[in-house]
Amino acid sequence: MIKAVLLASSMMTAMTAAPAAVAQVDIITVTSQKRAESIQDVPISIIALGTDKLDELEISAFEDYVKYLPSVTFQSTAPNATTIYFRGVVSGNDGNHSASLPSVGVYLDEQPVTTILGFLPIHIYDIDRVEAIAGPQGTLFGASAQSGVLRIITNKPDPSGFEAGADLEVNTIKDGDVGYQFEGFINHPISENAAIRLVGWYKRDGGYIDNVLGSRTFPTSMITKTNAALVENNFNDVETFGARAALRIDLDEDWTVTPTLMGQKLRSQGVFAFDPQVGDLDVNRFEPDFSNDKFYQAAMTVEGKLGNLDLVYAGAFLKRQIDSNYDYTDYAYYYDVLFGYGAYFYDDMYNLIDPTQFYQGDDSFTKYSNEFRISSPQDKRLRFVAGFFQNYQRHFIHQQYIVRDMNSIFEITGHPDTIWLTEQKRTDRDLALFTEVAFDITDRLTLTAGVRGYKYKNSLVGFFGYNASFSPDVFDMMGMFVRDGTGEAACNGAPPIVPNSPCTNLDRTVKDTGETHKFNLTYDVDDDKMIYVTYSTGFRPGGVNRRGTLPPYVADELVNYEGGFKTAWSDNQFILNGAFFWQKWKDFQFPILGQNGLTEIQNAAQARIFGFEADMTWAPTDRFTLSGAFSVIDGQLTKNFCGFVDENLVSETDCPQAVDNPLTDGDETLPPEAPSGTPLPVVPRFKGTLTARYEFPLGEFGAHLQGSVSGQGSSPSSLLAVDQLILGNQASFVVADFSAGVGKDNWELVAYVNNAFDERADLFDFVACAIGTCGSRAYQGTNVPRTIGVRFSSRFGVEE
């Protein structure tokens, strides 16, 4: 594709000088199979957005480009708290610090950047391409690639010549605030064999949610809480700033070393959802809401040759720190309304107090990974890639829920005013050996087989819960033991292992081994068309349930059967690709909110997902391009989810109508929490996008007009029948974006309007605590309202 350095100069010059003519679609080179090849030669369902496309679509963040990836859906509570899904592989309620690992792997170049609270909120600038690889990629990418892989590939240092660029942008949101960003890069050759590339950015996203005046009266104490001191319009603004530096050294003709260092800080205020009961884009928040998220990553890639074999080493070290504060008034209010919990909150003089809670979090991540792989020449009839992968990630979790002026008898030891404390260390480790072998049976028929053997070990240790006085051991009137207390009462004298914890009531480890497989048969109909069939599997490691009465959850497996095609017509004037898939999700991990709002994970039997996805690009002339993509996905349970396990600790499925509850000696009956046939949540049956771009001369300038439409159908909010009844479906929506620009030589000026018709997209419906408690007040996560902006870009340097 045309590189960023030519975005204004070559493109605008060509548009000015040349009449309309038949064109070709630019074919992107990808590395989704651990080697560079044309996207049209890869027998995988993949969509890639190259440098030009990222610039044309005004993309700077995940929320900007996910619209153009029809197989990808997501849930997001903040710009730095996003969980993504491929092809409908979602059960809901993901992203908790003590819950399942993600089912999608996210990579920055060669290094995985997925953490338990979601992937890094990487700013998109000076990026070569974004690759969305659908379906299990368990042989080449491993544990975090159960349903797909998202790869962000940066532009690399280039010793062949000097390049530089700068971009300035300002925008305004309808009934919201002003935003702006400054970005720039320099590629500077040091010698014929070395170059350095420096990239920097600052971005301010204006707010659009208003914290309006409101109050809550707690029925037990009749104390009224008001948010008058926190009332503010457009209070959810975001600042993002960071830099990236990469050095390339060609040691000789065969060996190259590329170290990279990247750092970013994101500061957000407010919340990114509104309360329809309060008003459109309005909320009532009674405590400050903010998050400070910073990370840095040091990485190194070494590429070389040993004889006719290609060798690659990729290693990375990542540190991430998230400090946050959030209002938890809904929890306190509804527990008082429904259960009278306000009676437990009084000061040292035993006067009832305001029971409002707020949350303070301090999450510290350390992650490092190493991969070594070797591959044979790709022009041979028999070829292979093989390697070793090691990954380690540690998460120190500090989360405390604070009630001001609470009686000290109920405080967590060493933590004033803290009603609930989580001080835990989570460690996830995995090792793998992998190989993939391809054999050309004929000139047109290729068989590929791959296997990955893995070993994981995951642990969770530390403290969670209440003070022993607030949640003690329980005895009946005869002094007979009824049940254990929680929190400090459950420590039983175990000393603290995690710093700042009062004691230890959780210390559990799970480990397992296994393997994933892939078989692919590809037939080249001719030089421009292929068809393929694939069988592949992916997995997600098991883990620890922090509630001690629950068993660990085991690894879940995704089995994928896929048939696809890739075609180019009329000398690459028209590209059409597609894939049919049928997936079986075995023992899938299902997180629910249990007692005290604790996340519990069970393996919920089985689900099936089938669908079709396609993308196309048409360039009838060198001035006009039409591109689009869509997916149709249907996923549902194939067995009941009863909500408890049998005597063998296996999720119970035999509850067609109602069954005795074994946890209460059978004195009540329970229907299935999610009956067989229940649709999987969050993912719409249809998601699609269409973009048209027309480039033309305008006097001595080059100009363009562009419009894009993206949308999706409705989707269930939850897998659980009761929760779905309360939350309902997430509504369908369609969003339109338009832009127009002019440029000459090395500059371009673009005006744009995003969400032109001010559509209020229903992206995520949720409540602040367990739905049975807080379900009468649901929040809606939404997109940014209509945004009008102007961007100026300039590029310097000669590519050739």
Question: At which residue positions do the language-model features occur?
Answer:
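Structural signature of Gram-negative outer-membrane beta-barrels, strongest in the C-terminal barrel
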Residues: 248-253, 262, 374-377, 389-391, ...
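Membrane-embedded beta-barrel scaffold of Gram-negative outer-membrane proteins
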Residues: 183, 301-329, 524-540, 554-641
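Solvent-exposed loop segments that connect transmembrane elements
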Residues: 208-234, 269-286, 327-360, 400-423, ...
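N-terminal periplasmic accessory domains that precede
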Residues: 62, 83-85, 107, 120, ...
